[in-house]
Swiss-Prot record:
It comes from Debaryomyces hansenii (strain ATCC 36239 / CBS 767 / BCRC 21394 / JCM 1990 / NBRC 0083 / IGC 2968) (Yeast). This is Transcription elongation factor SPT5. InterPro entries: KOW (IPR005824), KOW_Spt5_1 (IPR041973), KOW_Spt5_2 (IPR041975), KOW_Spt5_3 (IPR041976), KOW_Spt5_4 (IPR041977), KOW_Spt5_5 (IPR041978), NGN-domain (IPR005100), NGN-like_dom (IPR006645). The SPT4-SPT5 complex mediates both activation and inhibition of transcription elongation, and plays a role in pre-mRNA processing. This complex seems to be important for the stability of the RNA polymerase II elongation machinery on the chromatin template but not for the inherent ability of this machinery to translocate down the gene. It is found in: Nucleus.
Length: 967
């Protein structure tokens, strides 16, 4: 027993002795009396109180010594202190000896209860000694159990702490020798403080501890990213790979096995994750790079180990991908593959069911097999053929797709039919049939997931029972197919149109606003109008279409071009990020659509495609036997038709009987003046108060559907009777095309191809060109000798549709000959521009009658062998030896021997000096030009006589008489 414990025990005994002085005897021993249990309990309580008060007294002294030690003062016990300790120890020993003597003397007198109390005190004293002896080796400041904490109050805790500190200091002083120093005690105290703080940290609440660590180890600096932090985006340059990143290797493999190898490497890494993990980080492949897979690893040896035992791959043929090519290689591209999930439509690529539509029912665990639902093709053995060996010959014709029939299978091929799991499940020839459909497993490579495009008749085969419950909504599918076709065609290319206001959604240029300039398949060129960086304003940027979003304002009138609300129009009432809420014009309800599915609509019915484009605006349709009309407005599920009676009717597409397609020849009428009117002619109402005018759109019997640019209602279309209008201009009239200045004549560089020939053209005031729908022959140019039909014509040119080539050409009218009853008549002659018989000169100014004058003078070059109506040896137009209109021999114009216009041998131009020389001379003998000798006598082209000089030859030339007024 230590001296400290002896001190406490002795003092406690002394207190007990003094409290019971009356019980002492002369021999110095206590007088023990018989007491009941209550007295014994009271004495024990008093003992405990005395012990507690003694401990408090000593705790005060130990507290003072502890404060001195914490201030760094190391006190060594003095001689007086040591003597005090020794004396207290001796006193304790003496007291113990006295107690033992008293106990021996009074053993017989003490009852069993007192012995038990003493035993309990000794046991508790031993326990206390053992617990205090370990104070130097355990953390005396550790917290006790929760039960003890509940029992102890704050005062008891402080008292216990001070007592234990006092005991520890006392023990330290007791065990101290000369070698101990103040530094060692200070170091021991610091260790205990560190352990105490660590224990407190471990006992803290998890949330408090996490907040403490966050505040302790948080970053004290941030990386500057400019304005991108405020906008919520990160610059792509900060995400660029570097040489510190793991390397990527391109491994060559068998083409077509890329995805299979990636899947196998993934399974291998997952299998060896615990026993012998692979050190590869990533495995991927790109559809655009056939025959390669890519593995990311820190060491090449890890790739060799991962590829050990793999087939269809060439492990030695690997390439290190440069770091600068990482972004292009790792760029996220939308895969063209369709994710295979139950319920999607696919097509089979091999076997009896090649190109048949199927529905995915389930997938295998390895992902390589697909269980599909098909409409079976069975003939139940009715068309089976067998060879000599009894083997079945496969039929070359495929049976039509029909649902499985149990009756036919039992009737024709019952030996191969077995019952399956379920009331309508069967196994026929090793294949499973349920509810009439075939359920069969196919390899993944035998499944086509792209460009499936199911047809309505194929989908109808999968429809069973109630369409609302088990079947398919064919109407919805048809609408989706229509929308799909529209989006794949014009829809995709027209999602963004030049002039649209757009905003960049993501990337480095996010929040940039611009205007679309041009579009391509996947890229849009915009002109920046608003940007956070002023240097980009008014600059052109090329942005992927997926990164753009259309911008609209509240109040814009828009039209939906894609989705289930396609072709609906409405008014924008709210913009919510990428979505727009609009009020539909048709249903008067709010509709939410994606902003890129909208375009601005100028008219509610413009460009509306109803019933797949069967009808369009301004079409002439027939509603019933007696009612026809023109479509003036088209909505999603109805049309507005202006009838021939002038009534506006709203009809469904099913209410339209047919579309009237009348030829131009059938659409002809006469106006109130009796003039012919046709489609395209401009007419004006002469009866009524409105006096409307416009171009004829359709003609049906006596009703004219006219389109006016001055009327806004019904797309500018109105209807009237043909007898109420008069023709202003016709479609092919020159007047209608020459109301403005003729720019061709104002330009000196543009001249008519043949001014002389066109001088005889007469300006038409009304009616169509005579060449329209005539068969013509091309006389000159690259198409010389080809025939065709004139489809259009103006004052100079004609457009011809060739017979031999399905081609239209444009040629001048003067180079054409009109075919009339097999005879080719030149154009100028066809239009009646010639001045008289035998004269093809269109103007009628040179030769013959000039300016409506009588033909008294021979032609300009007549006489001799001249062709322009001259006589000579060859009579012209029935003439004899004389020239045009000359006398003598056989006259050509006037015939016989009778001279023309009383002229005998004299001149035809009023003269009487026949036989004289021409050109006013009288001494010209016989000239060759028109002489009596055959072919000019002895002179040609004047012989010895030249143009008025008569030396030799016959008579004068130029009409056998005096010409131009000579005698």
């Amino acid at each position: 027993m230590s001296e400290e414990e002896n001190r406490i025990t002795t003092s406690s005994d002394d207190v007990i002795k003094h409290e019971h002085p009356d019980n002492s005897t002369a021999g110095g021993a206590y007088e023990v009396q018989d007491r009941d249990q209550n007295d014994i309990d009271e004495e024990e309580e008093e003992k405990e109180e005395n012990k507690r008060s003694a401990e408090e007294e000593y705790s005060i002294g130990s507290k003072r010594s502890l404060e001195d030690s914490e201030e760094g003062e190391s006190k060594v016990p003095t001689e007086n202190d040591q003597a005090l300790i020794n004396n207290s120890g001796e006193g304790a020993e003496q007291q113990d000896n006295g107690d033992e003597a008293n106990d021996d003397e009074n053993d017989d007198e003490n009852d069993e209860d007192e012995d038990e109390d003493e035993d309990e005190e000794e046991v508790s004293s031993n326990k206390r000694k053992r617990r205090r002896g370990a104070n130097q080796f355990i953390d005396i400041e550790a917290e006790v159990d929760d039960e003890e904490e509940d029992e102890m109050d704050e005062d008891d805790e402080e008292a216990e702490l001070l007592r234990e500190q006092f005991i520890a200091d006392d023990s330290r002083v007791e065990t101290m020798d000369g070698k101990d120093s103040a530094g060692e005690h200070q170091d021991d105290r610091l260790h205990r403080q560190f352990d105490r703080r660590r224990q407190e940290a471990e006992d803290q609440d998890a949330e408090v501890l996490a907040e403490t660590l966050k505040q302790r180890y948080r970053k004290t600096h941030t990386v500057y990213r400019g304005d991108t932090t405020a906008s919520g985006t990160v610059s792509q340059k900060l995400l660029m790979p570097s040489i510190n990143d793991p390397a990527i290797y391109a491994i060559r493999c068998t083409p077509g096995r890329e995805k299979d190898l990636v899947r196998k490497l993934y399974e291998k890494k997952r299998t060896l994750a615990r026993s012998n993990p692979l050190e590869i980080l990533t495995v991927f492949q790109r559809d655009s790079f056939k025959g390669y897979i890519y593995i990311e690893a820190k060491k090449p040896e890890a790739i060799e180990r991962a590829l050990t035992g793999m087939v269809n791959i060439y492990a030695k043929q690997r390439l290190l991908v440069p770091v600068r090519e990482y972004p292009d290689l790792l760029k996220q591209v939308k895969s063209s593959d369709v994710e295979i999930v139950p319920g999607i439509y696919v097509r089979i690529t091999r076997g009896k069911y090649k190109n048949d539509l199927a529905i995915v029912d389930n997938l295998s665990e390895n992902g390589l097999d697909v269980r599909c639902k098909l409409v079976p093709r069975l003939d139940y053995g009715k068309n089976d053929d067998f060879d000599k060996d009894g083997k079945r010959i496969r039929s070359k014709t495929k049976p039509i797709p029909r649902l499985f029939s149990e009756q036919e299978a039992r009737m024709y091929d019952g030996e191969y039919l077995q019952s399956g799991r379920g009331p309508r499940a069967f196994i026929y020839r090793g294949e499973e049939y349920n509810e009439g459909f075939l359920f069969k497993d196919f390899k993944l490579q035998f499944i086509q997931t792209k460009d499936v495009h199911p047809k309505l008749e194929e989908l109808d085969r999968f429809q069973t029972g109630d369409p609302e419950e088990d079947g398919l909504d064919l109407a919805a599918i048809a609408a989706s197919l229509k929308n799909k076709n529209n989006s794949e065609g014009a829809g995709r290319s027209s999602a963004f149109q030049p002039g649209d206001k757009v905003e960049i959604r993501r990337g480095e240029q996010a929040k940039t606003i611009g205007k679309v300039l041009s579009t391509s398949l996947n890229e849009i060129t915009i002109l920046v109008t608003d940007s956070g960086d002023p240097k980009f304003v008014n600059q052109r940027l090329t942005v992927p279409a997926n990164d753009l979003r259309k911008l609209f304002s509240a109040g814009d009138h828009v039209r939906v071009i894609e989705g289930k609300h396609s072709d609906e129009t409405g008014l924008v009432i709210k913009i919510d990020n990428d979505s727009v809420i609009l009020l539909s014009d048709q249903t008067k309800q709010d509709v939410r659509v994606f902003a890129n599915y909208l375009i601005k609509a100028t008219d509610a019915s413009s460009n509306t495609d109803v019933t797949g484009g069967k009808y369009d605006l301004n079409d002439l349709v027939q509603l019933n036997v007696s009612t026809v009309g023109v479509i003036v407005k088209a909505e999603k599920s109805s049309f507005e038709v202006l009838t021939s009676e002038g009534r506006l009717m709203s009809v469904n597409p099913a209410g339209i009987a047919s579309k009237l397609e009348l030829s131009r020849r059938e659409q002809i009428a006469t106006d109130r003046n009796g003039s012919t009117v046709k489609i395209g002619d401009t007419v004006k109402e002469v009866l009524g108060d409105k006096k409307r005018e416009g171009a004829i759109l359709h003609i049906y019997k006596n009703s004219l559907f006219i389109k006016s640019n001055e009327i806004l209602e019904n797309l500018g279309v109105f209807v009237t009777n043909c007898m109420n209008v008069s023709t202003i201009t016709t479609k092919d009239s020159i007047v209608s095309k020459s109301l403005g200045p003729d720019l061709n004549r104002m330009n000196p560089n543009l001249k008519l191809p043949n001014p002389i020939a066109n001088a005889g053209l007469k300006t038409r005031v009304g009616g169509r060109d005579k060449l329209i729908y005539k068969d013509v022959l091309v006389n000159s140019g690259n198409y010389k000798g080809l025939m065709g039909k004139v489809t259009e014509a103006d004052e100079v040119y004609a457009r011809i549709e060739l017979h031999t080539k399905s081609k239209k050409i444009k040629v001048t009218k003067n180079s054409l000959s009109v075919l009339v009853r097999g005879e080719a008549i030149p154009y100028l002659r066809f239009i009646g521009a010639s001045s008289g018989p035998g004269n093809s000169n269109p103007s009628g100014n040179f030769g013959g009658a000039s300016f409506n004058q009588p033909a008294k003078t021979p032609a300009f070059s007549s006489g001799g062998k001249s062709s322009w109506g001259s006589g000579g040896a060859t009579p012209s137009v029935g003439g004899g030896a004389t020239a045009w209109g000359s006398g003598g021999a056989q006259s050509s114009w006037g015939g016989g021997k009778t001279p023309a216009y009383n002229s005998g041998n004299a001149s035809t131009w009023g003269g009487n000096a026949g036989g004289a020389s021409a050109w006013g001379n009288n001494n010209g003998n016989a000239s060759t030009w028109g002489s009596n000798s055959k072919n000019g006598g002895s002179s040609t082209w004047g012989g010895n006589s030249t143009w008025g000089n008569s030396n030799k030859g016959g008579k004068s030339s130029w009409g056998n008489g005096s010409a131009w007024g000579g005698k």
